[in-house]
Amino acid sequence: VCNENGEALDRVSIPTETPEITMPKMIAYFKEQQVEALGIGFFGPVILNEQSPKYGCVGNTPKLAWKWYPVLDEFKKALQIPVGFDTDVNAAALGEATWGITKGLKNSIYITVGTGIGAGVIVDGKMLHGMQHPEGGHILVAPHPNDTYKGKCPYHGRCLEGMASGPAIEERWGKKAYELSDKKEVWELEAYYVAQGLVDMIMLLSPERIVLGGGVMHQTHVMDLIRKETLRMVNKYIDTEELSDIENYIVLPSLNDNQGILGCAKLGMDALTAAK
């Protein structure tokens, strides 16, 4: 729970189980807090096309109990307050753009590298949705010549998420990312794949800054490797002031892992404003 200045007033963590177990707990909490509006940043894919009859539903998720669950409608029905709705990574992008390291920029990308990989894209000051929402983790990447790993993604195999997410690291190397901190070869390979995704996004979307968050990025020593690999792959084709200052172009989040919560607060505030 936050106020209009983005200051956290209260918080609780509720495990994601089935909708039948999790939703009543969340609804009860927000009723108790008597919030004026709610912002939801939900795991994707979700349906964000307001013209779709499935708007506000979870899409084709591997969390089968949540597949096509009408998250937005259930919260609206239970709470009877304005509700803003987006993906979890879009909420994080919005949090950084409102209060964090991309504040004041019109074009930025927030990428989370963790259990999955996702991208929240802001273009001309607005969140990019389009047909659904960007699925930056499923960009196809070229395998490293010495990498025989087939990829973790059940849909695409060797996509960015399939090659560089936390579960991919664990399956390839036999240990979780935090247990591999001192293994240079792990992070050089991670940088090789993450940089491919960044270069694709730089070429296509021309962001003014890229933020890399998520659990894998807690291994902060990988940042310099990613920056170096990104510049190598760009190969001076794009030669801007931003890229020449790469340490301030590809950056870590600035909101102490609160960017998602604060982005949800902004979604709620925007929904409240729109309802007046």
Task: Describe the residue ranges of each PLM region.
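Gly/Thr-rich phosphate-binding beta-strand-loop-beta motif of the actin/hexokinase/Hsp70
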Residues: 1-8, 110-126, 169
